[in-house]
Regions:
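Generic structural motif recognizing short loop/turn segments at the entrances and edges of beta-strands
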Residues: 2, 31-32, 185-187, 218
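FMN-binding flavodoxin-like domain, especially the glycine-rich phosphate-binding loop
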Residues: 2-4, 12-18, 25-38, 48-58, ...
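A charged nuclease-like catalytic/ligand-binding cleft shared by nucleic-acid processing domains
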Residues: 8
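Short acidic active-site motifs
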Residues: 42-45
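A mid-sequence, solvent-exposed acidic-amphipathic segment
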Residues: 169-199, 203-206
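Iron-sulfur cluster-binding cysteine motifs and their immediate structural context
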Residues: 191, 196, 200-221, 231-248
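C-terminal active-site rim and adjoining tail of enzyme catalytic domains
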Residues: 225
């Protein structure tokens, strides 16, 4: 196995971080790795993948994969390559989450992918309440070892499947139904006067739901395709995007994964100097 393709969907950066770390680890073992971010705007004609191993990474939304992930998989044609499906969640592999990959795996198999490996990676929670420093330091300090384990499983082409609790099939089904209302979150975002029209929210919107004329520094306009990844709200440098529908699901103090990572690196450096 020489060639590996990693596709990932990310909102606030957790899945992207996992994808980049895993890619670096696999490259260090002399594998050819292509990394691609999933945007709804890039889902066009059917794409046939020619790779030795395929890895799909996504955050858990409502106990399932985000809608654009399903749309992405449905536009792919596999070559029966061995495949890993990796979900990312603040709760990790707990009850309510064990069936979060089921629909994605089913769609991949239908598209001629040989799914042999399923995994869950825990990252700091971004829903309702962001973790405190002690909590996210504990989570992120374990990430390198987890990435090493995943890389070794991929390289050795081992078959590993997760146990799924029967109640989670029902929970995931309810989560799928809940997604029908996520567009209301995007429609309900209020753009405050602090907005500079920088265009960062539109550039990074994985659902292609935000329109803005960056040259004119106009304020963003939200469509009806929001998947509630929370990326635009948390990543706005001016904190100028204020949710009105479902606002309780956003931590008013913000969520900054880069800052968390820097703090963890600083703690590690301090320990090494002791």
């Amino acid at each position: 196995m020489k060639n590996i393709r990693i596709d990932y969907y990310t909102g606030t950066g957790g899945s992207e971080w996992v994808a980049r770390l895993l890619a670096d680890k696999l490259k260090s073992d002399n594998r050819n790795v292509v990394v691609n971010r999933i945007y709804r705007a890039n889902i066009n004609d059917m794409e046939t993948l020619e790779t030795d191993y395929y890895i799909l990474i996504f955050p858990v939304h409502s106990f399932c994969a985000p809608k654009p992930v399903y749309e992405w998989v449905e536009h792919l044609v596999g070559n029966h390559c061995k495949t890993a499906v990796i979900s990312v969640s603040g709760g990790g592999n707990v009850i309510t989450n064990t069936a979060c990959r089921c629909k994605t795996v089913k769609l991949l198999k239908k598209s001629n992918f040989n799914v042999i490996y399923e995994e869950m990676v825990r990252m700091p929670n971004n829903w309702m309440k962001a973790p405190n420093k002690k909590n996210y330091t504990h989570i992120l300090s374990k990430l390198p070892k987890k990435i090493d384990q995943i890389a070794q499983t991929v390289i050795s082409e081992q078959r590993r499947e997760k146990i799924i609790y029967w109640i989670d099939y029902l929970i995931s089904a309810l989560g799928e139904a809940e997604k029908g209302g996520t567009y209301k979150f995007g429609n309900g975002i209020k753009v405050l006067d602090a907005c500079t029209g920088c265009g960062l929210c539109a550039k990074n919107c994985c659902s292609s739901n935000i329109q803005i004329e960056r040259e004119l520094h106009t304020k963003p306009k939200f469509g009806n395709q929001c998947d509630m990844c929370l990326g635009c709200v948390y990543n706005c440098p001016q904190k100028a995007l204020q949710p009105t529908w479902g606002a309780f699901q956003v931590d008013k103090n913000g969520y900054n994964l880069r800052l968390m990572r820097q703090n963890v690196d600083d703690v590690a450096e301090e320990k090494s100097l002791c």
